[in-house]
Curated annotation (Swiss-Prot):
<keyword id="KW-0699">rRNA-binding</keyword>
<dbReference type="GO" id="GO:0008097">
    <property type="term" value="F:5S rRNA binding"/>
</dbReference>
<comment type="similarity">
    <text>Belongs to the universal ribosomal protein uL18 family.</text>
</comment>
<dbReference type="Pfam" id="PF17144">
    <property type="entry name" value="Ribosomal_L5e"/>
</dbReference>
<dbReference type="GO" id="GO:0022625">
    <property type="term" value="C:cytosolic large ribosomal subunit"/>
</dbReference>
<keyword id="KW-0694">RNA-binding</keyword>
<comment type="function">
    <text>This is one of the proteins that bind and probably mediate the attachment of the 5S RNA into the large ribosomal subunit, where it forms part of the central protuberance.</text>
</comment>
<dbReference type="InterPro" id="IPR005485">
    <property type="entry name" value="Rbsml_uL18_euk"/>
</dbReference>
<keyword id="KW-0687">Ribonucleoprotein</keyword>
<comment type="subunit">
    <text>Part of the 50S ribosomal subunit. Contacts the 5S and 23S rRNAs.</text>
</comment>
<dbReference type="GO" id="GO:0000027">
    <property type="term" value="P:ribosomal large subunit assembly"/>
</dbReference>
<dbReference type="GO" id="GO:0003735">
    <property type="term" value="F:structural constituent of ribosome"/>
</dbReference>
<protein>
    <recommendedName>
        <fullName>Large ribosomal subunit protein uL18</fullName>
    </recommendedName>
</protein>
<dbReference type="GO" id="GO:0006412">
    <property type="term" value="P:translation"/>
</dbReference>
<keyword id="KW-0689">Ribosomal protein</keyword>
Length: 193
């Protein structure tokens, strides 16, 4: 390993695969707060963060678990949940007076229609000003869950496959075909906060 002066050990967070310091420096030099969006398999987290010498400060945050408390019955890891999380974060940020930000996607690859960009679209719809390209954001029918509705309708013929695929939706009392209306209701509730 490190036997001579030519070998340089990377920073710990770089070794752990958590931080791209070159990208982080570019974002910090902008002087704007960062919209940090992270997705796991079952949840989406969004935070508005600003730099401080002692460590980053979270100005506002939103999580899909907050959506569940507001009455969301769908899966918390899908695109509609990511969009609603971004909308909730944007609404909170505008109330706090932070209307401008820059997207921090972390180590996620920039893929068209990804959940991180659904969070971005939600924050934009809440009134935030974030530089972006329109081609990277998913279509409106994916953000409101129409693709889930279409898939559920195509699977309806095979009752066993339908019940297996959408068991959690049915358990929570939400018919998957009603997801777009459910998302629209929750969107209205968030916008009226």
């Amino acid at each position: 390993m490190a036997k001579n002066a030519k070998f340089r050990v990377p920073f710990r967070r770089r070794r752990e695969g958590k931080t791209d310091f070159r990208q982080r420096l570019g974002l910090l030099l902008s002087g704007k707060p960062r919209l940090v969006a992270r997705k796991s398999l079952n949840n989406v987290t969004a935070q508005l963060m600003s730099y401080d010498e002692k460590g980053d400060v979270v100005l506002v945050s939103a999580h899909t678990k907050e959506l569940v408390k507001m009455g969301y019955k769908g899966h918390c890891g899908n695109l509609p949940a990511a969009y609603l999380t971004g909308l909730l974060l944007g609404k909170k940020a505008v109330k706090e007076g932070a209307e401008e930000a820059i997207l921090d996607k972390g180590l996620h690859r920039a893929t068209k229609g990804a959940a991180i960009f659904a969070v971005l679209k939600g924050a934009l719809d809440a009134g935030m000003d974030i530089p972006h390209g329109d081609e990277i954001i998913a279509e409106e029918e994916r953000l409101n869950g129409t693709h889930v509705k279409n898939y559920a309708e195509s699977l309806k013929e095979d009752a066993d496959a339908y019940k297996k695929q959408f068991s959690k939706y049915l358990e929570k009392g939400l018919n998957p075909e009603d997801l777009p209306e459910h998302v629209a209701e929750l969107k209205e509730k968030i916008l009226n906060l």
